[in-house]
Amino acid sequence: MRFAHTWTTCSVRSTRDVTPAIREIVLRPEGTGIENYPIGSHVTIGVLIDGRPETRCYSLVGDFSPDGYRIAVRRAPDSRGGSRYMWTLKPGARVEVSSPASLLEIDWSRSSYCLIAGGIGITPIFGIAAALMRRNADVRLHYAVKSRDDAAFLDELSELLGDRLIVHAGDEGQRIDLDDTFAGLPPDAATIICGPMRLLEAARRRWAAAARPPTDLRYETFGSSGLLPTASFRVRIENSGREIMVPDNRSMLDALNEAGYEVMSDCQRGECGVCAIDVVAVDGQIDHRDVFFSDHQKQTNRKICPCVSRAVGAITVNTLYLNDISRS
């Protein structure tokens, strides 16, 4: 396992709405301090969904602070319930929180950096921008939002970056032009992006079209976004006769584990590929929401990351191990 989580009880220190739909929550560990953590880290938080204990991952906002873990949660009407639960938390509430972890490796030696954030994807990008500014790096942050009213932390970012912050507000007709953005970068520039799947996929295609090294484009993800609407779907287990329904508010990974199938997982963000399983048939369409597989691999529909990816209709999978308790 890549992450060896240490869990601690945290209390909610404060909450504030940074936009009408995004709430900042500061969590303070009880009885212990906060150790320094890498820029771009996230924490896993224990939540209750319809009375069931589950977990959700949230990126840490801004720089390291000894005062607490700072996260931002978008209220999502079509979410699986995590954001709804987090929005019920008041100062003094207690939750279980993992130690911070990061899959994002940043090369701090580049001469130029392009940061791109889409919507709530600003949460990990904020801290990266602050770290680069401290290093006097050549950095530009492109912030794509529906409107300026929907732009979380806009005042703080403006103060930090000045004219290095470029806001692309959709309602003002200022959509980001990825071809133009990438064409203006020096040859050794690194780009780091976090946003919805459509933005990530578009960036990957335009980056390749610009003949830039794939390793110079790095991602931070949030798994709730997809190319298709979130709906319930069916998973058939090859040669077993079993069919498992995945509700619209549950992940495929959770549904398989609850049905007794042991599916290994790690990041649960669609980044590491540990949970990937084989797909042998598709009766409908797969909505690949990971950034682990390449575009070509996704088009073949031979594997799926069940932690974030979904389907419309039904899929048949194999190579799953049914634990002894479920067999009895």
Regions found by a protein language model. Give the residues of each.
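Ferredoxin-reductase
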Residues: 2-94, 108, 145-147
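FNR/FR-type flavoprotein reductase catalytic core
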Residues: 3, 81-241, 245
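Short, surface-exposed secondary-structure boundary micro-motifs
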Residues: 48, 100-101, 280
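Local cysteine-cluster metal-coordination motifs and their immediate loop/turn environment
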Residues: 124, 261-284, 288, 296-313
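Short flanking/linker segments adjacent to small metal-binding domains or redox-active Cys/His motifs
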Residues: 171-173, 247, 309-328
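C-terminal accessory/binding modules appended to enzymatic or scaffolding proteins
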Residues: 233-264
